[in-house]
């Protein structure tokens, strides 16, 4: 572990089409085996199909979906005197964003549509409307934290 200083955060360039940094992070998470052009094609085609289906700006739908999936609180394991407690802690904004991106992509990959772009657009639309597996994951996380509220004094 570094003793001296925290490494500075890397600057992520905004995506070429919409000029959005969060969308660029999402694209990097969709990417497999370093194939960014494939990830770009999947994401942009998903956003185009969202625009065709709901007649709204796809970037607004994307950010709405992301906000609906971001967790506010999560549980972390804390060992106290031989027992392990699930302690509820608040989620930092950067971690909340990373978790939301991860959950949206995992939920998309688990869907049954034919292409990844169709699965991604479906999951983003569901999340924007507070439905879908990614939103369910967030609600499960919040429910778990609520159930373990008694251990919140073990926070660190």
UniProtKB/Swiss-Prot annotation:
Functional summary from the UniProt entry: One of the primary rRNA binding proteins, it binds directly to 16S rRNA where it nucleates assembly of the head domain of the 30S subunit. Is located at the subunit interface close to the decoding center, probably blocks exit of the E-site tRNA.
Subunit structure: Part of the 30S ribosomal subunit. Contacts proteins S9 and S11.
UniProt similarity note: Belongs to the universal ribosomal protein uS7 family.
InterPro entries the UniProt entry points to: Ribosomal_uS7, Ribosomal_uS7_bac/org-type, Ribosomal_uS7_CS, Ribosomal_uS7_dom, Ribosomal_uS7_dom_sf
Protein's UniProt name: Small ribosomal subunit protein uS7
Any one Gene Ontology cellular component term annotated for this protein: small ribosomal subunit
Cited Pfam families: Ribosomal_S7 (PF00177)
Assigned keywords, A-Z: Ribonucleoprotein, Ribosomal protein, RNA-binding, rRNA-binding, tRNA-binding
SUPFAM superfamilies: Ribosomal protein S7 (SSF47973)
GO terms of biological process kind: translation
MF-aspect GO terms: rRNA binding; structural constituent of ribosome; tRNA binding
Organism: Zymomonas mobilis subsp. mobilis (strain ATCC 31821 / ZM4 / CP4)
